[in-house]
């Protein structure tokens, strides 16, 4: 955003932009996010409802084993780590206006997360008016890169190598 590093092309993949809300509201959202995370970690049904195993398990992998491993790993997060993840993801500072740059920017999001990305898309359009907004059909957040890495690479190559 400062223009200190020359960048010809940039992909913002489902990027979370800073909240444009009062501090107290941001703290309440942090509490909601932490509670949601802890509920998913401590209740397998909630975790699987949020990320259905049949959709988020790589082909050839056992969904039960995968989700057992995810569940065990997520339980290692301390409350402070969870707090830091959510707070830093939503509450960082950018310059009031970005540097005047010639960077080609695209913002990717999964079509199935469009409602969740509405404020992020609005922010990107305002902050980087030259950005191209691109919805990825039939995808949820992070699904393209996690489950379809070859397709992710095709999108990447198409944007970076044109």
Where are these predicted regions, by residue range?
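Short, conserved loop/helix-junction motifs that constitute active-site signature segments
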Residues: 97-102, 126-128
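Conserved alpha/beta-hydrolase catalytic His-Asp/Glu region
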Residues: 21-22, 43-99
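C-terminal alpha-helix
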Residues: 154-162
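Short beta-strand/loop motif that positions the catalytic acidic residue
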Residues: 101, 107-109
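Flexible "cap/lid" loop of the alpha/beta hydrolase fold
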Residues: 2, 6-39
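Catalytic histidine-centered segment of alpha/beta-hydrolase-like enzymes
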Residues: 136-153
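Conserved alpha/beta-hydrolase "acid-adjacent" motif
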Residues: 114-120
């Amino acid at each position: 955003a400062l223009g200190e590093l020359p960048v010809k092309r940039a992909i913002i993949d489902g990027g979370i932009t800073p909240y444009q809300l009062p501090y107290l509201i941001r703290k309440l959202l942090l509490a909601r996010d932490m509670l949601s995370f802890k509920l998913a970690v401590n209740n397998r049904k909630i975790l699987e409802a949020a990320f259905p195993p049949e959709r988020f398990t790589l082909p050839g992998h056992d969904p039960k084993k995968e989700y057992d491993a995810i569940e065990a790993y997520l339980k290692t997060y301390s409350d402070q780590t969870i707090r830091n993840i959510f707070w830093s993801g939503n509450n960082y500072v950018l310059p009031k206006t970005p540097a005047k740059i010639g960077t080609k920017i695209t913002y990717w999001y999964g079509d199935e997360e469009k409602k969740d990305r509405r404020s992020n898309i609005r922010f990107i359009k305002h902050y980087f008016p030259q950005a191209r907004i691109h919805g990825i059909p039939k995808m949820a957040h992070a699904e393209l890169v996690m489950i379809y890495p070859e397709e992710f690479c095709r999108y990447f190559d198409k944007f970076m190598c044109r």
